[in-house]
Each structure stands twice: as structure tokens, then as C-alpha cells.
């Protein structure tokens, strides 16, 4: 069917909309990384420097701010039935713009997440991850997965039903009215090896900030992400 075809081949019809949003975003995105520098005291000796009698013959690790640190972007595509397909499409174009911006300056890993209930395995939870090629960024697939209600509600919900008896609810431990913050905090370490450099975009809501003011949301996410890393490192 059309959903399966586009899931395989992608769909670029909304890429121009994402590019319009991207045109309004003009900032450099920095994240810290670890590097070694010469020092009088440090973790180990640089043998050539010792032989040469250089005073800065040891190496110490420092944190620098640059544009090479990899970022993992997790996008929850699950949504309440009250969220219209048009709203999901608009939301997806803004998220695509963010991914496009990040991928221009550093390695990015992009995954779409289906987070629903499930009763076959007794956990009350089904997580389906869909990793999208970002080296280089597969615009067609990213655009379709991020903007399509069909991908989320037909394909991933169908898989969840088949694999783990999805019954139409949110996963165990998730409270929609509370925003799901604590659930996501516990989910991130289960999915990525470096939670400090992970940006999770939560399930769609009618009052999403990214829908009200896309440019402001993009800038806020980038600022928040960078600030969090500076505090955690």
C-alpha cells in the first residue's frame, strides 16, 4: 500500500516547507568534546616530548567547544488520536528543519520512536525504533517518517499490535496529562549510549511550542541542548 511504499522510498513533498523554516534559523551550534593537550602534569607522558626535554611533556584531557560532537535525535511519533494529520505534518517539517541544521555541522543520528502499550510480553510497553540514514541525510525517508500520520498510525501501530498486542494506549509508566517527562528520562538511557548528547522530542500536543513559534522553538532546543551539555560535562 501507499504507506509501505513511502516508508521504503520516502517522500520529499514537504522538504521545501522544512527549508523555509531552516532559512529563518541562523546560528552556530556548538557542543563540547574531549581532547588532549600538552601540560606539565597530566594523565600520561608523550615519549617524544620527554626525549626532547620539553617541559610540557605530559598530556591532560580538556573539554572544548566545537562542531564535531555527534548528536542523537530521538523523535516520538506516537500521538493522541485528537492530533490531526495536518498538525503532525507541520510538526514534522519543523523537526526535519532541526535535523537538517544539525546535520550540516556535525554527525547526527536520527531515530523515530513508537511508544505505546503492549501486553504480549507482560511489560505493558512496546518501543519500536526506526533509524533513518543520516550519513548523508536521507531527506526523502526523514521527511516521510517525521511528517506522516500514516507511518505512525498505520505502520508502527500495526507492528505494535502484531508483535506485542498493542491495545491503543500509552506505555506503562507514561502519563499523558503530566507530559511524560519522567518516562522519557528513563527511556533515553535505554536507547542511547551517550544520554548527555541526546535530544528527545516528545509526543505531539495541540499546544506544542514548535507549532506556535517554530523558529523560537528551534533556537530554544539548540540552546537548551548546549547548556545541558556544558553543565553535565
What are these regions, as identified by a protein language model?
Residues 1-72, 77-233:
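Acidic, low-complexity intrinsically disordered regions
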